[in-house]
Amino acid sequence: MHFKSGFVTIIGRPNVGKSTLLNGIIGEKIAIMSSKPQTTRHKITGVFNDENSQIIFVDTPGIHKPKNKLGDYMVNSAKSAVDDVDVVILMVDHSTKIGPGDEYLLEFIKAAKVDVILVINKVDLISPDEFKGIYDYYSNLDFIKKIVGLSAINGKGITDLVETIKSELPEGPAFYPTDHMTDQTERTIVSEIVREKVLMYIDEEIPHGVAVEVQSMKTRKNKDNIEIYDIEVDIICEKQSHKGIIIGKEGRKLKGIGKSARQDVEKLLQTKVNLQLFVKVREGWRDNDNFLRGLGYKE
């Protein structure tokens, strides 16, 4: 079999399971996951390798109606991700009825003129009749080339999806070394891990007004000559009242966030970690161009 390689964008509405799917395909946690919509803010590249292919995946923020400059960035980022790719994965689930948001997304993808594989997620939670209804609706769209059902959270159907993607890719060499898994730096992954834990521990709308910025990452040896990573991270919120909620009574919320994040960061870095979290208030940061650029958001 000839070697195949290519670029694939995963796109869909917020909270349909795009990051869960990406992590499942790559086999490592490179995108944070949460039940809250709009968890992913940046495009994330993940690289799948096997003996006869290399697939470069781009996970995107969910397409939604933006309410601020951060939202504008996220939606523009998702839209630009379909440029110059070989295949688009359009991911949907059964939990919401097809509405104006879906129709808008379909019109956008149709205009992109690229091969589209529809992925119906959470098939383990729907009946055969429900699956057929979704399948029939999308199979009538001429730009949908193939349809795959799967459950991203338990891995069912992921292998079939990968084989389907391979069938649509051109022959060509690998773009990255075989041990390359993501384009994210350790610093970026650490900040995303902390943000994931904020999403996990904090309810209501507060998480959407939270940014995370790694201020420093330094290694040192302790008295037993064991390497330790000292990491300082700012959790930035928009209101003083939000700061108190994130910290929690007697600091319990922040301690929980820190403990859970530290465990994941230690797995990532394969070393002991001293993680210090600081909660800071910056009003209106989601509409501040300079601040957004400092966090890595670009037009």
Task: Name each region found by the language model.
Residues G17, G157, K253:
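Conserved glycine(s) of the Walker
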Residues D59, N121, S151:
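Active-site glycine-centered loops adjacent to acidic/histidine catalytic or metal-binding residues
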Residues M1-D84:
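Conserved G1/Walker A P-loop phosphate-binding module
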Residues N49-Q54, N76-I147, K221-D224:
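Conserved C-terminal guanine-recognition region of P-loop GTPase G domains, centered on the G4
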Residues E186-E299:
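P-loop NTP-binding site
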Residues T40, I63-K65, K97-I98, I126-S127, ...:
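Catalytic P-loop NTPase motifs of RecA-like helicase/translocase cores
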Residues D115, D124-E186:
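Canonical P-loop GTPase G-domain recognition
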Residues E28, V47-E51, P66, A81, ...:
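Conserved, well-folded catalytic cores of nucleic-acid-processing
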